[in-house]
Every structure is written in C-alpha cells, then in structure tokens.
Design a protein with these regions (language model features):
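TOPRIM fold recognition
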Residues: 3-6, 12-117
C-alpha cells in the first residue's frame, strides 16, 4: 500500500515478516525503489552486520540521501529479520524497527556508534 509507510528490507524472506514491505534486490534498488514509490514514506532495514563494508556503505548513502534507516540496537545479536523471527513476534519486530529508525543527524550519530568497520 503506497499510502502507508513502506519497509524496504534486504531480502525477500525478511519481507514476509513485516507489513507493507518490499525486498531490495539488486544493486540498482537504492535508486529504483524511491522512483517507483515516489511520495511514499519509506524505512530502510538492512541486515544487522556492522562489520560488513557493503552494508555500512549502503546505510551511509541512504542517510546522505535523507532516508529513514533502521539502526539496530546493540541488544540484538541476530543478523536479520528472518533470524529475529525465531525468538520475537512480528508485532514486536515491527515495533522495535519503528523505535530504531532515524534520519538526518540522529541517524548519522547512531550509525557511527553501531558500525564496527
């Protein structure tokens, strides 16, 4: 539903656990998804891999573009939504993502604390 916030996740399986979500597949997704969902509020949820240079690069780029990005809290050891679903309800996952989604300066500060690269 493009009238509601769309959750852009890294993989197709992750998209099964969130309402109104779409999987970011392929290198062009960072440019194509915003074009297709113009004027739609979006949150980007990438995998919880603070040592992965590619993920860190994507997050940094999304923040620079003014995107809303989920910065995983330190208490979450799981790598992605799929893994998290084994121990947490989808409602709780959605709430946690909403509470840890930031943009602008706050996103930059949280990202710097989160990344390990």
């Amino acid at each position: 539903n493009p009238k509601k916030r769309v959750y852009v996740v890294e993989g197709p399986i992750d998209s099964l656990f969130l309402k109104n979500s779409v999987a970011m597949v392929g290198a062009g997704a960072l440019k194509e998804i915003p074009k297709r969902l113009e004027n739609t509020p979006m949150s980007y949820i990438l995998d919880n891999e603070p040592r992965n240079r590619q993920i860190c690069s994507y997050i940094e780029k999304l923040i620079e573009l003014g995107g809303d990005v989920c910065i995983w809290p330190d208490i979450i050891p799981e790598k992605d939504i799929n893994d998290l679903a084994y121990r947490m309800s989808t409602r709780r996952i959605q709430k946690m993502i909403d509470e840890n989604t930031f943009n602008g300066l706050e996103a930059t500060l949280r990202f710097r604390e989160w990344r390990k690269v």
